[in-house]
């Protein structure tokens, strides 16, 4: 199996291109069948928002819905709203909406807790299934998102397993009979590189390992087919491409073949088969309901539902294959355009493309690295209203400028204007100003 992305290589050779113009971008917007979906969001007029891979944009429906929950359902309905406003069913009802975006079936997903907490639960479950197998290795990528590695380190230490970190190029050779669980993030947060979930899952199963997939940069961004890929466990984020708001509840999925074996390490009362019987001993709820732990955050779930509905609105544009098929077509066109414009207009500025050109290996973001000034360049862009973000490099890769492309609210003219600002920041040396080189607490 080939690695999911090519090694970092300097781009923007001095070649002759058929230049793309602003008029071309405006023509693409005029032809875009999804352009009306932008009207679902509140976006400041002076902002070009390319950071939906960190925090999605606020849906217009969210403030009114949250106010309704606070003033009516809580303020007037009070505790009755657990029944009359269907609060009790929210984790499963929202889970069914997520299922439509990740290739899962109704009743297989719940929205609850954070990504980190849900990862703890599903990885614990996978390790419990393998506890008598003699397998002691958990495999993950060295470049995985740190919280995943921290959770895995903690669980491996507690459960007597060993975490082994690899490079993507080592798959599938590293999948030996010592491996209990393969834990991967579907789309890499630093590079935008996307794994072939179906092929890797098949290789893991052939080696006797279970798979845990993190969909934080996939759900709402790219088509995901959990059941078709025969994956074992998955978790994902609610506040990125799903537009659920800061700190929105995450989600968890388990393949139905494991549902009866899932061992809940956080056996709170909300995951009990009959929580309002108040019995002294835990009896897990059937199926995915046992993923729940404590009383659910109703106001946050209401905000998440508004975000989910913005994504599901794209189903109308591809009724056969669903929302993600429609969004994926535009996402690839946006990222292709961004790469092309940067190649045309930023040659000689020291940028390197680290996101795969191959559509089959690319998420919904474009990442560029630079030996000097990546953080300051991002800050200078933000000061101009072009919001992307920065991620620190390592011994194998310089610092990174990340740009997320959410087709629900980004247009082709937005891409043109963003690159125009990037050109100006680079050519004028604006990024060298002192205020852009002072690190903020959140980068």
Positions of the model-derived regions?
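Pyridoxal 5′-phosphate
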Residues: 12-443
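Arg/Lys-rich, positively charged N-terminal/basic patches that mediate binding to nucleic acids
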Residues: 5
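Cysteine-centered motifs
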Residues: 8-9
């Amino acid at each position: 199996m080939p690695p999911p992305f090519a090694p970092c290589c300097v781009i923007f050779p001095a070649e002759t291109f058929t230049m793309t113009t602003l008029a071309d971008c405006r023509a693409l917007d005029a032809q875009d069948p999804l352009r009306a979906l932008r009207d679902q969001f509140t976006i400041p007029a002076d902002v070009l928002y390319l950071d939906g891979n960190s925090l999605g944009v606020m849906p217009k429906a969210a403030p009114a819905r949250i106010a309704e929950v606070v003033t009516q359902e809580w303020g007037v309905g009070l505790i009755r709203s657990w029944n009359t406003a269907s609060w009790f069913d929210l984790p499963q009802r929202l889970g069914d909406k997520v299922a439509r975006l990740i290739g899962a079936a109704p009743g297989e997903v719940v929205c609850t807790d954070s990504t980190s907490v849900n990862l703890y639960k599903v990885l614990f479950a996978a390790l419990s299934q393998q506890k008598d197998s003699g397998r002691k290795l958990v495999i993950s990528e060295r470049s995985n998102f740190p919280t995943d590695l921290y959770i895995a380190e903690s669980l491996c230490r507690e459960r007597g397993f060993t975490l082994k970190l690899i490079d993507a190029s080592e798959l599938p050779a590293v999948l030996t009979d010592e491996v209990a669980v393969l834990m991967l993030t579907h789309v890499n947060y630093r590079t935008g590189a996307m794994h072939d979930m179906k092929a890797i899952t098949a290789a893991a199963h052939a080696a006797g390992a279970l798979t845990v997939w993190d969909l934080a940069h996939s759900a709402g961004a790219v088509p995901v087919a959990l059941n078709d890929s025969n994956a074992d466990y998955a978790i994902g984020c609610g506040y990125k491409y799903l537009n659920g708001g800061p700190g929105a509840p995450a989600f968890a999925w388990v393949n139905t073949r494991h549902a009866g074996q899932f061992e809940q390490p956080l056996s709170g009362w909300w995951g009990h088969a009959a929580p309002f019987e108040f019995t002294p001993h835990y009896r897990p709820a059937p199926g995915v309901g046992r993923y729940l732990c404590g009383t659910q955050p109703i106001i946050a779930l209401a905000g998440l539902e508004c975000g989910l509905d913005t994504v599901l609105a794209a189903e109308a544009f591809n009724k056969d294959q669903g929302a993600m098929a429609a969004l994926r077509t535009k996402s690839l066109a946006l990222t292709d355009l961004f790469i092309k414009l940067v190649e045309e207009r930023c040659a000689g500025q020291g940028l390197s493309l680290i996101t795969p050109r191959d559509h089959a290996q690319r998420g919904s973001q474009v990442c560029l690295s630079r030996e000097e000034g990546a953080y300051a360049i991002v800050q200078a862009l933000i000061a101009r209203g072009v919001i992307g973000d920065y991620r620190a490099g390592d011994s194998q890769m310089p610092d990174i400028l990340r740009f997320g492309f959410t087709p629900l609210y980004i247009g082709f003219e937005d891409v043109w204007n963003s690159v125009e600002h990037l050109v100006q920041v680079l050519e004028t040396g604006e990024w060298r100003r002192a205020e852009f080189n002072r690190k903020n607490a959140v980068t």
